[in-house]
């Protein structure tokens, strides 16, 4: 049987290679099946570590914990990551969203367990510890409790405070990531056994530090999604109740006097077959209404004739005007016009006789 360390390493490797980075869709049966089996393995491993083997105790410090056991403090962190990816395959959308809400809340609980465990061992970053202390109900935190809020509702500095805290977390996370990378390189190039154990212990502690900062981001994302799903489910229930009430009203018989509490249909015809008026109406010029909408918002087709369009273009000065005068049609019965054309032809003949072809510009060739 594999040791606890081997089981833990196998689960983390499986998460990194096939669950965190995968070509499968998260809602596919293959992915969810692998995810569920991994969660079960990690839960069994957690029971073995904390209950059966009792590797951790509330009356000890981190110095009392062996180097090989330090990484097991991140079990709840990985549980939170895995559970947040769970999805239901129910065909009903509301039921599917309801199950997702449950999974997200379970994920937040696992993240809180992880932070609480680090706090017990005095390993929690002060920024993270401050946020953990702001939760009124630690295992049921609200999105508004993650960041400092102004005392006065009229104070508009809430966004500025949130931005400031986010920048602090980001810079702190970046600093820890750099130290973690340096430790990994140093451990890889170190060959001495004594220094190797110290570097490995420091690496495990720095990794837990990095996980605690990342946990805040995961909690924020989960709470934001929980808020969206809660609003979605509330609206769905309200719509179902409204539609049920409407159906019950429609199923009741109409009043004998003809009274009804149903809303009138806008598309109801004006008159029935007998000529009786069914609803109030106002005589309007429909063509004029459509014409006014042509240049407004929305996609309306043209509702004017070509002549109207050209008149409008002329009014707005979009039509180019001017140019040469059009030639008048020749009037062969006009004697003056015939004389002018005759003289013009004679002049052209005389010009051609006095100017031989090719006698123009000879380009200095003689």
Curated annotation (Swiss-Prot):
InterPro entries: TAP42/TAP46-like_sf (IPR038511), TAP46-like (IPR007304). One of its GO terms (biological process) is regulation of TORC1 signaling. Keywords: Phosphoprotein, Signal transduction inhibitor. GO terms for molecular function: protein phosphatase 2A binding. GO terms for cellular component: cytosol; protein phosphatase type 2A complex. Residues 318-366 are annotated as: Disordered. Residues 324-336 have a biased composition (Acidic residues). Phosphorylated by TOR kinases. Dephosphorylated by CDC55, TPD3 and SIT4. Residues 337-356 have a biased composition (Basic and acidic residues). Involved in negative regulation of the TOR signaling pathway in response to type of available nitrogen source. Inhibitor of PP2A phosphatase SIT4, which results in inhibition of nuclear export of MSN2, due to lack of dephosphorylation by SIT4. Also required for rapamycin induced activation of expression of many nitrogen discrimination pathway (NDP) genes. In complex with PPH21, required for organization of the actin cytoskeletom during the cell cycle via a Rho GTPase-dependent mechanism. Associates with the PP2a (PPH21 and PPH22) and SIT4 protein phosphatase catalytic subunits. Interacts with PPG1, PPH3 and TIP41. Belongs to the IGBP1/TAP42 family. This is Type 2A phosphatase-associated protein 42. It comes from Saccharomyces cerevisiae (strain ATCC 204508 / S288c). The gene is TAP42.
């Amino acid at each position: 049987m594999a040791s606890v360390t081997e089981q833990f390493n196998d689960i983390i490797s499986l998460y990194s290679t096939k669950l965190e980075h995968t070509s499968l869709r998260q809602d596919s049966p293959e992915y969810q099946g692998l995810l569920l089996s991994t969660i079960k393995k990690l839960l069994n491993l957690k029971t073995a570590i904390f209950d059966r083997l009792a590797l951790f105790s509330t009356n000890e410090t981190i110095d009392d914990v062996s180097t090989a056991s330090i990484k097991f403090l991140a079990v709840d962190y990985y549980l939170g990551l895995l559970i947040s990816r769970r999805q239901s395959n129910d065909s009903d959308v509301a039921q599917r969203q309801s199950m997702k809400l449950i999974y997200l809340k379970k994920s937040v609980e696992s993240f809180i367990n992880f932070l609480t465990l680090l706090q017990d061992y005095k390993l929690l970053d002060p920024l993270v510890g401050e946020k953990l202390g702001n939760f009124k109900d630690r295992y049921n935190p609200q999105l508004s409790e993650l960041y400092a809020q102004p005392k006065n509702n009229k104070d508009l500095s809430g966004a500025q405070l949130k931005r400031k805290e986010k920048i602090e977390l980001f810079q702190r996370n970046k600093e820890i990531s750099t130290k973690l990378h340096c430790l990994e390189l140093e451990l890889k190039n170190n060959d001495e056994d004594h220094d190797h154990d110290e570097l490995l212990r420091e690496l495990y502690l720095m990794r837990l530090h990095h996980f605690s900062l990342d946990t805040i981001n995961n909690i924020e994302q989960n709470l934001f999604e929980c808020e969206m799903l809660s609003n979605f489910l509330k609206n769905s229930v309200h719509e179902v109740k409204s539609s049920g009430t409407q159906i019950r009203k429609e199923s009741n018989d109409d009043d004998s006097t003809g009274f009804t509490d149903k809303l009138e249909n806008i598309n109801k015809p004006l008159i029935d077959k007998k000529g009786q008026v069914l609803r109030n109406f106002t005589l309007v010029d429909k063509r004029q209404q459509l014409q006014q909408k042509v240049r407004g918002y929305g996609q309306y087709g043209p509702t004017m004739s070509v002549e109207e369009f050209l008149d409008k273009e002329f009014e707005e000065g979009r039509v180019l005007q001017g140019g040469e005068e059009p030639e008048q049609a020749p009037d062969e019965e006009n004697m003056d016009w015939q004389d002018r054309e005759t003289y013009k032809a004679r002049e052209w003949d005389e010009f051609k006789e006095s100017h031989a072809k090719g006698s123009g510009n000879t380009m200095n060739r003689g």
